[in-house]
Amino acid sequence: MTTDRNLFFCASLLIFLGVLMSYSLSTYTTVVLYHYGEFHFFIRQLVSAIMGIIIMWGLSRVDPRKWFSRLGFFLLFVPSLLIIGMFFLPESLSSSAGGAKRWIRLGFFSLAPLEFLKIGFTFFLAWSLSRTFVAKEKANVKEELITFVPYSFVFVALAIGVGVLQNDLGQIVLLGAVLAVLLVFSGGSVHLFGLIVSGAFAISVLAIVTSEHRILRLKLWWSNLQNSLFTLLPDKLANALRISDLPESYQVFHAGNAMHNGGLLGQGLGLGQIKLGFLSEVHTDMVLAGIAEEWGFLGLCVCFILFSVMIVLIFRIANRLKEPKYSLFCVGVVLLIGFSLVINAFGVGGIFPVKGLAVPFLSYGGSSLLANCIAIGLVLSLARYTKG
């Protein structure tokens, strides 16, 4: 089998596993909390999965020389306009949650424009960086900073639209990481990368300390982390460093219990306990904890192996491509998938604060699934282009 066929098969297998877990982990939530039919979330995710696989296959057949840029700019501008437009829509079409509007209701389907904007932003970076950093000869840090200034304005606008209007710092962290690493892949120096990371860290600290909600999340994270870290220290030193009266991290605590209950081989599909009201939305952001409980450590390893294979295959395709914008886009897709997985996994494990990022292909959510299928479909079209 060729690389692109392996990639299509790998993505389809992850999608199948995601649909399977959307049923196994959502039954309690569906029936008890929302009073829907038992198969409500399963059917919605199954429909999204079928649509996603069809879209992925269809995009793999298009000629990127004609359609890549058109689709990329479409995914950049249309979701941006929708994110702005959501705040002018009535509650019946775009309901508020925590002071933010993130979904547009379209009858049976709810659309999250940000998921598609992430693909459009990755395209924009690949298209633009190939015309600036890649096209230029090696420059000093000052010249690199001057070249980077327009990107900083674009990112600030994105941060306002997503981080402020949608109150979603996690997505900004993800997109900022993609921007910083793609700069290195496009020829930016390590010094520039260090300056950008330092600036991003300072801005992140400012964003956290000015939000009570984010401060609480940070406290929840440290509450769990200090309990783990201080077991390695002598009792006197641990007691001196420990900050008392911190709230317990509800999500991470039960996620840890789920992983402990799963052991090596798991409780069995559908037999997990964490979904029974302990973490009612386990089929979304905490899906890895649900998989660990029902499939065990080995089942979780299988998922990570599939993601690793997918990343290697996309890198192989990127290495074959001669046009920088195509190869940079493939690298950007790897970064989106890889960083989303790592940030989510570290959040579930208590290493990072919980950010609310979905696990690509596995977490429940039609918009996230379709957006990732579009990304893989575009990569497959580029792989086919290298043959023709």
Curated annotation (Swiss-Prot):
A single GO molecular function term of this UniProt record: lipid-linked peptidoglycan transporter activity
Main localization, broad class: membrane
Compartment(s) of residence: Cell inner membrane
Residues exposed to the Periplasmic side: 28-38, 92-105, 166-168, 211-294, 349-358
Matches recorded under PANTHER family: CELL CYCLE PROTEIN (PTHR30474), PEPTIDOGLYCAN GLYCOSYLTRANSFERASE FTSW-RELATED (PTHR30474:SF2)
Family designation: Belongs to the SEDS family. FtsW subfamily.
Record keywords: Cell cycle, Cell division, Cell inner membrane, Cell membrane, Cell shape, Cell wall biogenesis/degradation, Glycosyltransferase, Membrane, Peptidoglycan synthesis, Transferase, Transmembrane, Transmembrane helix
Record-given protein name: Probable peptidoglycan glycosyltransferase FtsW
Pathway: Cell wall biogenesis; peptidoglycan biosynthesis
E.C. code: 2.4.99.28
Organism expressing this protein natively: Helicobacter pylori (strain J99 / ATCC 700824) (Campylobacter pylori J99)
Transmembrane segments: 7-27, 39-59, 71-91, 106-126, 145-165, 169-186, 188-210, 295-315, 328-348, 359-379
Role played: Peptidoglycan polymerase that is essential for cell division.
Lineage: Bacteria, Pseudomonadati, Campylobacterota, Epsilonproteobacteria, Campylobacterales
